[in-house]
């Protein structure tokens, strides 16, 4: 994920698909182990109305093998249709991208889509967009319980996905090592992000080791950071918001800020400054390049423009310092020196720089005591088809001064190999892909595959650097079979704002260039892109070899007991349906749930209480995994879980009561499984 709340529309769009209600569904009697949920009506937490639920079942149109065939249950829809709204990354987020912070990060930027999408259409009923598949019942969904009423969905925040921390460029040859507490690259901007600090609430677990100290973070002067001028950043003016009480600088923009460059955030690929009018209850403020921020209603009269720029400049300066410190802290040795739960780490008792790590521990491999301990965690199960991953410290250009640690990547891969056989990267900067390949080689992992990531930015310099590095990686690879494909861009269309048409053309051109290079080199690898589920249309489907959609029920304000069903239903109706009549594969490229930090009620509105909507927490994360993971494994749903490890530096993107940006991992930054969290074992079945 990448950016504040991403939205998903239920519009027909250019795909020309018929309204869901017009489809005839044939049920199949499969997976009889899917049991019905409670008898009787369930209360809709959003409106208090009773909702009848039936059993999970399957549709014939491309949904084979998705459950048993119970009697169709009545529609769960009511007379209202909630519409959340935003998502991720700004063009400032340079190359490589980090896994992402979480949605609230981009609250300062409009979702770039608005209520205008509803204008000029004939709603099926009051306040319900005609393009929505409102008549589809939950009986066609293999997950239990069934989905709630249709509503606009969100994607991951800037915090999530690539937006989290834009990754950087190829790192000069450096020896592998650890990160030290005296090195800025080893420290988080805030030493104790999980403890109560001001408005920041403690997470489900406390900080350890390097993070538990009370030392002040190392100051970093952004003027000392190398910059190639390709990462523009400017904070959004502080607009009055009826939809959000707090706003945050987008993760991608924040990453760009690390370079110390202030610039106008135009639409992706030179997009216009007009806000996207596709979705959302309130028109945007025209910052299409911003992350997936919630809708921000402009102040009447426009406010004082000059004062706004002054305040913006000051805020930008502050954010630059924060992001620089936070991003640099991405390579914290905390990961390398903590012992994993149920596994004893044999080395790394103190934080070290990358070079010091190698000097002390050597180039870690499968025979290293520390690695053996990490690879023997009985609480981890290989039940995820894929996991989104970005190594720490790969923000460009910070990685040029504070190189990431090879040993830390090796440690991460030792853990990831117990969860999945498939890892997705977001960019090529800072040697991140090469480090992952080296780790796989040292660990002698034979069944791990990689989806290569290429960060596409509004600045051609960034995109060019990323693509050229992809070519080098492919050309230098000893064995191409380790790669599953290349993902060119993450949520590029979302970040394009209202100028999606030209952005799509540019994106498709980049994809075609990569395809041509592969063909020239006789490389048979699929080329795709990942974006919000509702940003896909027939044109993009035709250009991509694989349809990859980021779908986050949390940002849609979906109660966790309905989240799994909602996710599958949304994906089926908006993405799988687009591939009907083709042989193209569909993958959910990001899906997950935060382990703490508040709750989200969608629509850009404040929650009435702390239990409304989607609640972040370990119990809720367990519930979502319980409803999603094993059933997805049984029915063959292909997806990437977001994400394996927390990224504490992202605390800088937490705002008000939305403190989940740094809490999307199954494990903390030290690779400890979070207290109380249980990864399903699915009866011993594993992902292949």
Swiss-Prot record:
This entry carries the following GO cellular component terms, namely: cell surface; extracellular region; fungal-type cell wall; plasma membrane
Q: What top-level class of enzyme does the UniProt entry assign?
A: hydrolase
Q: Name one GO molecular function term.
A: glucan endo-1,3-beta-D-glucosidase activity
Origin organism of this chain?
Aspergillus fumigatus (strain CBS 144.89 / FGSC A1163 / CEA10) (Neosartorya fumigata)
Cellular compartment(s)? Cell membrane
Name the membrane topology term.
Single-pass type II membrane protein
| Designated gene of the protein | btgC
Side of membrane Extracellular, spans: 329-688
Q: Does the keyword Cell wall biogenesis/degradation apply?
A: yes
User: What is the purpose of this protein?
Assistant: Glucanases play a role in cell expansion during growth, in cell-cell fusion during mating, and in spore release during sporulation. This enzyme may be involved in beta-glucan degradation. Active on laminarin and lichenan.
What family does this belong to? Belongs to the glycosyl hydrolase 17 family.
Alphabetic keyword roster: Carbohydrate metabolism, Cell membrane, Cell wall biogenesis/degradation, Glycoprotein, Hydrolase, Membrane, Polysaccharide degradation, Signal-anchor, Transmembrane, Transmembrane helix
The protein's predominant localisation is membrane
- Cite the ranges annotated as topological domain Cytoplasmic: 1-307
> GO BP, one example?
polysaccharide catabolic process
UniProt entry tagged with the keyword Transmembrane helix? yes
Name of the protein in its database record? Probable glucan endo-1,3-beta-glucosidase btgC
- InterPro entries assigned to the protein according to its UniProt record, in alphabetical order: Beta-glucan_modifiers, Glycoside_hydrolase_SF
Q: Which residues form the active site?
A: 491 (proton donor), 590 (nucleophile)
UniProt-listed Enzyme Commission number(s): 3.2.1.39
């Amino acid at each position: 994920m990448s950016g504040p709340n991403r939205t998903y529309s239920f519009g027909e769009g250019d795909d020309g698909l018929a309204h869901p209600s017009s489809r005839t569904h044939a049920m199949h009697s499969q997976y009889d182990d899917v049991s019905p949920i409670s008898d009787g009506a369930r209360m809709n937490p959003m409106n208090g109305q009773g909702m009848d639920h039936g059993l999970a079942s399957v549709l014939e149109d491309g949904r084979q093998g998705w459950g048993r065939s119970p009697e169709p249950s009545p529609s769960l829809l009511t007379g209202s249709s909630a519409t959340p709204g935003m998502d991720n990354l700004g063009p400032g987020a340079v190359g490589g991208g980090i896994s992402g912070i979480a949605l609230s990060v981009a609250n300062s930027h409009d979702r770039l889509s608005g209520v205008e999408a509803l204008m000029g259409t004939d709603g099926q009923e009051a306040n319900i967009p005609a393009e929505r598949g409102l008549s589809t019942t939950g009986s066609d969904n293999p997950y239990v319980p069934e989905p709630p009423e249709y509503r606009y969905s969100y994607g991951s925040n800037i915090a999530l996905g690539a937006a989290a921390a834009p990754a950087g460029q190829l790192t000069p040859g450096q020896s592998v090592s650890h990160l030290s507490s005296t090195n800025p690259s080893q420290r988080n901007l805030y030493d104790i992000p999980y403890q109560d600090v001001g408005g920041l609430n403690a997470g489900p677990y406390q900080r350890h080791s390097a993070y538990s100290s009370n030392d002040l973070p190392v100051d970093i002067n952004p003027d000392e950071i190398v910059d190639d001028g390709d990462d523009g950043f400017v904070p959004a003016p502080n607009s009055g918001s009826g939809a959000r009480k707090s706003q945050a600088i987008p993760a991608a923009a924040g990453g760009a800020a690390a370079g110390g460059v202030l610039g106008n955030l135009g639409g992706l690929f030179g997009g216009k400054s007009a806000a996207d009018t596709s979705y959302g209850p309130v028109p945007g403020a025209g910052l299409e390049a911003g992350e997936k921020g919630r809708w921000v209603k402009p102040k009447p009269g426009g406010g004082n423009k000059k004062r706004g720029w002054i305040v913006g400049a000051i805020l930008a300066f502050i954010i630059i310092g924060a992001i620089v410190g936070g991003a640099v802290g991405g390579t914290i040795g905390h990961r390398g020196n903590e012992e994993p739960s149920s596994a004893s780490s044999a080395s790394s008792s103190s934080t070290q720089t990358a070079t010091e790590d190698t000097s002390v521990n050597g180039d870690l491999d499968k025979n290293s005591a520390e690695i053996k301990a990490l690879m023997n965690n009985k609480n981890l199960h290989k039940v995820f088809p894929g996991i989104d991953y970005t190594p720490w410290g790969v923000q460009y250009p910070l990685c040029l001064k504070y190189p990431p640690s090879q040993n830390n990547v090796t440690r991460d891969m030792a853990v990831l190999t117990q969860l999945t056989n498939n890892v997705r990267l977001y960019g090529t900067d800072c040697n991140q892909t090469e480090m992952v390949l080296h780790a796989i080689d040292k660990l002698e992992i034979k069944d791990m595959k990689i989806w290569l990531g290429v960060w596409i930015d509004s600045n051609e310099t960034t995109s060019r650097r990323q693509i050229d590095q992809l070519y080098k990686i492919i050309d230098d690879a000893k064995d191409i079979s380790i790669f599953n494909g290349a993902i060119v861009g993450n949520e590029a269309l979302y970040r394009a704002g209202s100028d999606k048409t030209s952005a799509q053309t540019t994106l498709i051109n980049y994809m075609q260039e990569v395809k041509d290079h592969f063909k020239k080199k006789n490389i048979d690898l699929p080329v795709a892109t990942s974006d919000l589920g509702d940003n896909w249309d027939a044109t993009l489907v035709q250009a991509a070899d694989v349809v990859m959609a980021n779908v986050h029920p949390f940002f849609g304000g979906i109660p966790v007991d309905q989240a799994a069903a909602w996710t599958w239903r949304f994906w089926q109706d908006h993405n799988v349906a687009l591939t009907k009549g083709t042989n193209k594969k569909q993958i959910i490229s990001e899906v997950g749930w935060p382990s703490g930090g508040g709750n989200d009620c969608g629509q850009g509105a404040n929650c009435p209480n702390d239990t409304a909507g989607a609640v972040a927490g370990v119990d809720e994360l367990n519930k979502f995994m319980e409803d999603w993971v094993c059933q997805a494994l049984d029915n063959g749903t292909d997806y990437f879980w977001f994400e394996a490890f927390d990224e504490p530096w992202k605390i800088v993107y937490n705002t008000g009561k939305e403190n989940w940006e740094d809490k999307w991992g199954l494990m903390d930054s030290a690779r400890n499984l979070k207290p109380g969290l249980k990864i399903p074992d699915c009866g011993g079945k594993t992902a292949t």
